[in-house]
Amino acid sequence: MKRIGILGAGTWGMALARMLTVSGNDVLVWSAIEKEIDSLSTTRKHPNLPQMKIPDELRFTKNIEEVCKDKDILLFAVPSVFVRSTAAKARPYVADGQIIVDVAKGIEPDTLYTMTEILADELGKEGGPKGVRLVALSGPTHAEEVAIDLPTTIVSASPDVEAAQFVQEVFSNSVMRVYTNEDIKGVELSGAMKNVIALGVGISTGLGYGDNARAALITRGIAEIARLGVAMGCNVHTFAGLAGIGDLIVTATSMHSRNNRAGILIGKGET
């Protein structure tokens, strides 16, 4: 049994929290929204995951120090725009050498940092830990499916191979297969850039175009992402894997995908 602290109680954070709890881990979830914590702990239901029952063993807290202290893994599951501010709040309580897992996807506009680069920057400031072990967890994963134990694959990415393998071991179970990859930059870049292509695919659908156009956008889209990644020092093979083409396919084709749905509405002229 591992002790896991999760910062963020959105759909992805809660789907993972349930999965990790069912696997026998001691999981504690924190949210900056106190009403959210009250509702989740009382109703044992998440409003955006109606089919998911929150296990009685899964615990909640409003205290950020409590969620950070004495944990084998500290998982950041807040939206990308809140990763830096949440890291700043957590900084005084993060232990030296702590394994930090990020599941948010995106690029910070002002710095062009990936999410783990933001965490390294913010946690490295005065009053923070003396080094952390950063892992990005990314792939073709909709929370709606993980929440009801549908088969899923994901990538644990870090240049720290031992940390990536530790996360692989903790998150693996009968319905979740975890692969490792040392190319954390490529994995994170894939997770951010696929949203742009998925939006375009949705727009093409909304305009009434067919499968031919969607296939072209997905295929040429991953080629563009790969070229950008290689120029930034990433491994080209990353983009042909789960975190690359895999994540792009699921985001560009599924109605679970907000980017796909938004694109469809744009294409129809409804937004």
Predicted regions and their residues:
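Histidine/acidic-rich helix-loop-helix segments that form or flank divalent-metal centers
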Residues: 239, 245
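Glycine-rich phosphate/pyrophosphate-binding beta-alpha loops
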Residues: 142-143, 205, 248-255
